């Protein structure tokens, strides 16, 4: 079977880059995926824990401050979607190029992806400052939440180019098999954020404004460190000299990045709609969903991290034409992620009230609503592992259309109608169960898309 990238010219790699190619295309896939997944899982867990710690500290202020985090989360999801578009799009291309031992084009693509991300983030930040209050109202803020949301949003906007660049760098490094170095950058930023949160929020008396300041500063440090580590351990170095944008390179980024853009954008849009629908039932409802979203993000972190360990294995071996290894890695990753999600779903269902109360103990109404929402989401959580792995697999092998469909399904195609219909038919109960309905429908859609593409791989 010819290599899918056989029309590309092979360029000389460094010994470290060739050694990495040999490792990713010959080592047993189960051990290989797990080895690459562990640092990615740690990075995701650290990020999830940071989000929870952020919520914990802000939760000590008042309900409106917690709700403000939920409002700005919609914005964060959208800018993350753009960062993932560049990071996953360029990263998928890079892993296939390195699978074909072409480090020259891989290095150019890495530079194009990162610089494009930073410039886009700067433009978004300027627009955000010009239209701050209308943007926050659009994202679902109420009049009582708006002052807190503005305080937090101000510093998030200042850090937007660096926040986005961190997400892009994380993806670029992971797709080269450098998850450990990426983990170091992510963990440094998260640890700094956890340290700065109580200092700024309580020590300096800045409140929710301090939480935004801590986030922006920590992301700047994280980005700087990852940029310094980019060319280590056989990674391709990034520099402005290699920033050579072209229509074809952006097409390649789009082919691999559109599914991530669709998934993350839908997450932001769904969060926006959820804020508006939940807002019909008061600030406590918005705060409840804000807390639960951070708990479920942490629960999903290790599962997504395991999928991120699968991605470079998939990309390298698909680029090298070793399709049996791609299939084996996919099946292994689906099994592990499903077992993990099932264990966490059971634990989350049993201890839902205790988990939510950790962050909003002072507001029993938020604790009650949040526990209900979390239990409903736990019912469908075991199904999400397979859906995520199918999406990552399709994205890495450049099956853009089915990958976009799967990416949009859980947070868009199914969740948004479920929110409106659920609210119309069942009231607040319908809003609470909307995510579980969307998860189940997405799983049913992913089954044929994943299996059919897996069976046809290498035969087309």
Regions found by a protein language model. Name each.
Residues 2-37, 94-161, 203-258, 314-380, ...:
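Short alpha-helical transmembrane segments in multi-pass integral membrane proteins
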Residues 87, 156-174, 182-190, 211-224, ...:
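Short runs within selected transmembrane alpha-helices of multi-pass transporters and secretion channels
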Residues 78-81, 193-198, 222-227, 298-301, ...:
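Hydrophobic transmembrane alpha-helices of multi-pass small-molecule transporters
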Residues 35-54, 155, 189, 218-222, ...:
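Transmembrane helical elements of multi-pass membrane transporters/channels
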Residues 66-126, 163-182, 288-352, 384-406:
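Small-residue-rich hydrophobic transmembrane alpha-helices
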Residues 63-74, 149-153, 212, 283-294, ...:
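Small-residue hotspots at the loop-to-helix junctions and early N-terminal turns
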Residues 24-56, 60-61, 77-89, 93, ...:
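N-terminal transmembrane alpha-helices
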Residues 45, 49-67, 136-143, 199-206, ...:
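Helix-terminus/linker motif at the lipid-water interface of multi-pass membrane proteins
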């Amino acid at each position: 079977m010819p290599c899918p990238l056989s029309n590309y010219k092979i360029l000389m790699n460094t010994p470290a880059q060739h050694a990495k190619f040999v490792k990713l295309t010959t080592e047993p896939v189960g051990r290989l995926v797990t080895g690459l997944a562990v640092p990615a899982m740690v990075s995701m867990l650290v990020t999830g824990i940071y989000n929870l710690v952020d919520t914990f500290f802000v939760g000590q202020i008042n309900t409106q401050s917690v709700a403000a985090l939920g409002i700005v989360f919609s914005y964060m999801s959208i800018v993350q979607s753009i960062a993932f578009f560049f990071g996953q799009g360029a990263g998928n291309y890079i892993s296939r190029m390195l699978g074909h031992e072409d480090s020259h084009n891989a290095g150019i693509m890495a530079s194009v992806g990162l610089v494009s991300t930073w410039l886009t983030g700067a433009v978004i930040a300027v627009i955000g400052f010009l239209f701050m209050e209308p943007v926050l109202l659009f994202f679902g803020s109420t009049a009582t939440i708006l002052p807190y949301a503005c305080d937090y949003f101000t510093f998030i906007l200042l850090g937007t180019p660096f926040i986005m660049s961190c997400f892009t760098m994380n993806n670029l490094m992971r797709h080269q098999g450098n998850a450990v170095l990426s983990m170091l950058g992510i963990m440094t930023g998260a640890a700094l954020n956890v340290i700065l949160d109580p200092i700024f929020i309580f020590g300096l008396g800045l409140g929710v404004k301090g939480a935004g300041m801590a986030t922006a500063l920590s992301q700047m440090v994280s980005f700087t460190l990852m940029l310094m580590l980019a060319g280590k351990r056989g990674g391709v170095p990034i520099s402005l000299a290699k920033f050579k944008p072209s229509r074809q390179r952006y097409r390649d980024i789009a082919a691999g990045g559109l599914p991530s853009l669709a998934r993350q954008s839908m997450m932001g849009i769904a969060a926006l709609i959820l804020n508006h629908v939940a807002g019909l039932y008061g600030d406590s409802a918005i705060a409840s969903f804000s807390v639960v979203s951070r708990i479920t993000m942490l629960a999903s972190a290790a599962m997504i991290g395991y999928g991120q360990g699968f991605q470079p294995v998939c990309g390298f071996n698909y680029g090298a034409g070793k399709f049996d290894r791609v299939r084996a890695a996919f099946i292994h990753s689906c099994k592990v992620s499903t077992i993990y999600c099932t264990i966490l779903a059971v634990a989350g269902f049993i201890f839902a009230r205790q988990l939510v109360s950790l962050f909003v103990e002072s507001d029993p109404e938020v604790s009650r609503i949040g526990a209900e929402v979390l239990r409903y989401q736990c019912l469908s959580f075991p199904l999400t592992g397979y859906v995520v792995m199918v999406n990552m697999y399709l994205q890495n092998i450049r099956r853009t259309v089915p990958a976009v469909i799967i990416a949009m399904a859980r947070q868009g195609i199914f969740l948004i109608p479920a929110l409106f219909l659920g609210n119309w038919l069942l009231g607040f109960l319908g809003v609470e169960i909307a995510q579980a309905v969307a998860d189940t429908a997405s799983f049913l859609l992913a089954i044929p898309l994943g299996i059919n593409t897996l069976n046809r791989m290498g035969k087309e």
